[in-house]
């Protein structure tokens, strides 16, 4: 397994629309395993392949406290089951150290394929509903900051760029 570099906002590659997975291969399974390792190390609860510069429709998530309930969604489709929305404070591994409220449908149906290539369908609410919609946005080239006002988005961009520069300086200092 390997840790994968996570793209940071405003990297334009985050705007790439992901292509469907044509076949679940060993390469796809390995990418999912690497994505789990990367997500757990970050740490995070969800990661879309687009965030690690692989522009295919693949999402990994684990919402459990003990990090022992991994979920994989290949070629996911999400359908709102209600018009009712709920605000939820979101963060993102591609937008480090930034959190803000986003309104999303409170209940959704998820249709996807698992790592064995089998189709499945679940209904979700709460954190799972929020997380799958957040990760689906990544596959469509969208970030949670796109839901914010232009002024807030510009401030987020400046903060993230500063954080990324600081991380780069720390990497250089460690290499010396």
UniProtKB/Swiss-Prot annotation:
This is Peptide deformylase. It is an enzyme of class 3 (hydrolase). NCBIfam families: pept_deformyl, PRK00150.1-3. The gene is def. Fe cation binds at residues 92, 134, 138. The keyword Metal-binding applies. Its cofactor is Fe(2+). It holds the Pfam family Pep_deformylase. It catalyses: N-terminal N-formyl-L-methionyl-[peptide] + H2O = N-terminal L-methionyl-[peptide] + formate. Belongs to the polypeptide deformylase family. Keywords: Hydrolase, Iron, Metal-binding, Protein biosynthesis. The active site is at 135.
